[in-house]
A protein has these predicted regions:
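Metal-associated gating/positioning segment near the N- to mid-region
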Residues: 51-113
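Short, acidic/polar
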Residues: 71-79, 131-141, 217
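N-terminal metal-binding scaffold of metallo-dependent hydrolase/deaminase domains
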Residues: 1-41
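Active-site mouth loops of central-metabolism enzymes
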Residues: 60-73, 94-96, 122-135, 202-209
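Active-site metal-binding motif and surrounding structural segment of the metallo-beta-lactamase
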Residues: 37-53
């Protein structure tokens, strides 16, 4: 079945599109964009003028929680929520139980994502075993299993030598390292950005230098 969307505004930065275009869909597949093509027999849908038609969004920081924390989220529910909001691809952090620091967990996540058959899922492996910041994960194994990047998610890698090795190995496999830049010894028990407003509210401040030092490193 063919459907013709008449769009008041279509945006596709990759193709330099930003304006009023028609979009022809054939059996769920986008087949043609423009305004001069054969759409005979197609169902015509006028897209509301305040809507924007664009390619699916990508979320690079998602907590799917499965395996191990299904009471918070599952791959099924997380990917369903993603596509409902227009996100057709997501990268999931390794904060699972067990942590995604080996091929077995990565393959489990990908199998579950295939079974859910909704958003595309790109696993992010852990920098360190168990995200404990002590022993480097097998980055080659994670890459081979399907990880697209490495990160210890919300845990900063305090060991500078471990981070250096992670960067060196990740570079060999052309994998980004997503770092949580925060020096916990400087953060202390702060709960708000250090400054006038934190002081006025009586809140312990978080100094900006706690993040800046980790970035500079």
């Amino acid at each position: 079945m063919k459907t013709l969307l008449r769009c008041s505004r279509m945006v596709d930065p990759g193709r330099g599109i930003d304006g009023a275009y028609d979009l022809l869909i054939d059996n769920g597949v986008f087949v043609q964009v423009g305004g001069d093509f054969d759409a005979s027999g197609a169902k015509i849908v006028d897209v509301p003028p305040d809507w924007v038609v664009c390619p699916g969004f990508i979320d690079m920081h998602v907590h799917l929680r499965e395996p191990g924390q299904e009471h918070k989220e599952t791959i099924e529910t997380g990917t369903a929520s993603a596509v409902a909001g227009g996100f057709t691809a997501i990268a999931c952090m390794p904060n699972t139980d067990p942590v995604n620091d080996n091929a077995g967990v990565t393959e489990f996540i990908l199998a579950k994502a295939t079974q859910a058959n909704k958003a595309r899922v790109y696993p992010i492996g852990a920098v360190s075993r168990g995200s404990l910041g002590k022993q480097l994960s097998d980055i080659a194994e994670l890459r081979k299993a399907g990880c697209v990047a490495i990160s210890d998610d919300g845990y900063p890698v305090a060991d500078a030598l471990l981070m250096r090795r992670a960067l060196e190995y990740a570079d060999m496999f052309q994998m980004p390292v997503i770092d949580h830049c925060e020096d916990l010894s400087l953060k202390g028990d702060g709960v708000a950005h250090e400054g006038f407003h934190a002081s006025a509210l009586g809140l312990r401040g978080l100094p900006a230098v706690a993040e800046e030092l980790m970035v500079e490193r």
